[in-house]
Amino acid sequence: MVKSKLTRFALLIISLVLSISVLAGCGESGSSNTSTSGNSSSGSDAGSSKPVTILNVSYDPTRELYQEYNEAFVKYWKNKTGQDVTVQQSHGGSGSQARTVIDGNEADVVTLALAYDIDSINKNKELINKEWQKRLPDNSTPYTSTIVFLVRKDNPKNIKDWDDLIKPGIQVITPNPKTSGGARWNYLAAWGYALKKNNNDEQKAREFVKALFENVPVLDSGARGSTTTFVERGIGDVLIAWENEAFLSINELGKDKFKIVVPSISILAEPPVSVVDSVVDKKGTREVAEAYLEYLYSDEGQEIAAKNYYRPRNEAIAKKFENQFPKINLFTIDEVFGGWGKAQKEHFDDGGVFDQIYVKK
């Protein structure tokens, strides 16, 4: 049986013969892939031309982004320093990925779905400098995204906005907020909509989100799993999705099968990045790890982000791709929820609002 295009891009099976090899990689959570710049040659990185390997522990829907970006970075680093660098990838639900680092997965860099997940890596001991968000522009968030809806051909349930997701008989697909960063963005986007519609009435927002999750038949652990449930397994009427994941589904499977619905209001999703200080200092990889994240802000890095449907921070690159992204009324987590620390504690920690309103199927 021929696998669908979505299965092929999710598994990232690359057979092109390139000067940059794509090998089988490692990682303790989710799937992995490795990019390398090829044979070692003379050059220097901190006084050494020895090949170096770094591990990027990332969240679910960045697989395609970092597959392309890693190839670009290793070429850039080879040309600049003469040094070969191998980038290994690990992908999964953002919260689960953070926990693997806490448990000893030696990530040189983390590129996760939200700031709280990076902060949580310091739960038991300080692995990352507490001022990590100040080390790179835009609070160490080189690209942004938002939350949209993916519906089936011709939108048979006529889904137009958040209110339609709580109607009787509508099946909504979204991941588990306890394990997935994207799911937490989805949840907060819905909560923020309900607040703004109901004059900041917290009780009405709670009732709205409770009703929404009553329409969720299954909670996958990560965003890519929910996409597979909706697209391949045919479950659900609407997928609440990262914008890039919705675009990717349409481009891989065709506009004749799915349609993106842009809600009247959504949340500005800011997925941050950081080196893991304890690991890079132990392994001696700080220079290349920092350069790896800094290059995300380069023109090439920003173009790669935009081509993979992440909204670039660079204004010139954003202008170039402005017709690709719909205009959406966005609010921030700081404006509505007082930041990730407060939102996590109130809504997603054990015994929080989500645990109170969600009834397991």
Give residue spans per PLM region.
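Ligand-binding pocket segment of bilobal, Venus flytrap-like solute-binding proteins
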Residues: 198-264
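Extracellular/periplasmic juxtamembrane helices and adjacent flexible linkers that interface
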Residues: 28, 280-361
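Bacterial N-terminal signal peptides that target proteins for export
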Residues: 2-13
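Early extracytoplasmic/lumenal segment of secretory-pathway proteins
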Residues: 26-30, 34, 38-124, 134-136, ...
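Extracytoplasmic
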Residues: 49-51, 82-84, 96, 104-106, ...
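A conserved helix-loop-strand patch within extracytoplasmic ligand-binding domains
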Residues: 122-196
